[in-house]
Amino acid sequence: KLWSMCRPEDIYKKPYTGLYCVGCEAFYLEKDVEDNTCPVHKKELETIEEENYFFKLSNYQDQLLELIESDKLRIFPENRKNEIVSFVKSGLEDFSISRSQERAKHWGVNVPGDDSRVMYVWFDALSSYINALGFADDEQGYTDFWAENQRRVHVIGKDIIRFHAVYWPAMLMSAGVPLPTELFVHGFFTIEGEKMSKSIGNVIQPKELVEDFGVDAVRYFLLREMPYADDGDISKDRLEIRYAELANQLGNLVSRVAAMTNKYFDGKIELPKVDWLKQDADLEDFMSHFNFKAYLDYTFEAVARANELIEKEQPFKTVKTDPEAAKKTLADACEIIRWVGTALLPIMPDSAAEILRRYSN
């Protein structure tokens, strides 16, 4: 349906010769590679010659530039937006949107009106965002979650940014379909600086990490280790360090404060009324910009403050001479822990729920 809705003048057929990577399922220009090698998979590119259908991307250069520079399509982080603006300004070339049945091994969606060709996987795959919602049959899900939704967000890896920030919006403009409103572009998890890849064989299995450390700890680790605008190098050793940090900083604080509260005040302390509006607004800003590392760093600054409070005031000592002062210290620590538990709900839902259960009023 999407193909058929595109403007007829935007799709045409011509012979094509290009450098192709099977792993990326993408063509590369000679100026974008060195030694005829795929920059992602480090394998030699194939020279492919065949007649294909092309999408006239050059028709949309000015519209795409205005769309991105005006933030009608917001791209995070800023360095990725700048990358795409530079790419569009350098001049857009029309791109292939079909493959021969032979090269596709007779697998794929046939081109409307031409059974000798199948749609190029990116035309097919990108349309899945809306087809999964019922676009092809005008279902309510498409209306609710795409056509009439105010936020249409894609979360993508940096290696496919051009497909999502340039090709996909142009296809949608041609078809008269609403565009995504935001793209969050993340880097790679790397092993010693190399992208994890099945073809290279340097893969860490998430299931094994979860079995060893639990899903909450792994989620925390991955979100805190990934720099906002770059790749994040990970290893099991790094996870063990973060896991110990989580236990020592947060786990120990939660257990220690609960134990003192139970021992000295029968587990009953009235929490102070604290205005967390600024902190909540800061967290909302981090989350709305998909800066999960900053979100967690900010949250754990509060954990550090609570630990410092306990070390400085030493309620386990002052309870003997000034129980009201000890109670206030523990109440303040309890309130910080309660706020931290709330902040961690989207990151570590099981652990956060347990914190809130223990520190509820």
Identify what each model region corresponds to.
Residues Y28, E44-L45:
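Cys/His-rich microdomains that often coordinate metals
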Residues V22-C24, V40-K43:
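Short Cys/His-rich metal-coordination motifs, predominantly Zn2+-binding knuckles/fingers
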Residues T17, E34-D35:
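Short metal-coordination and nucleic-acid-contact micro-motifs, chiefly zinc-binding Cys/His arrays
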Residues T37-H41, T47-K263, D297-T299:
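Structured secondary-structure scaffolds
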Residues K1-I11, E25:
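N-terminal Rossmann-like or analogous alpha/beta NTP/dinucleotide-binding catalytic cores
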Residues K14-F27, K81, V185:
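Short, glycine/charge-rich beta-strand/loop segments that flank catalytic centers
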Residues E9-P15, L45-E46:
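A short alpha-helix-loop-beta-strand transition element characteristic
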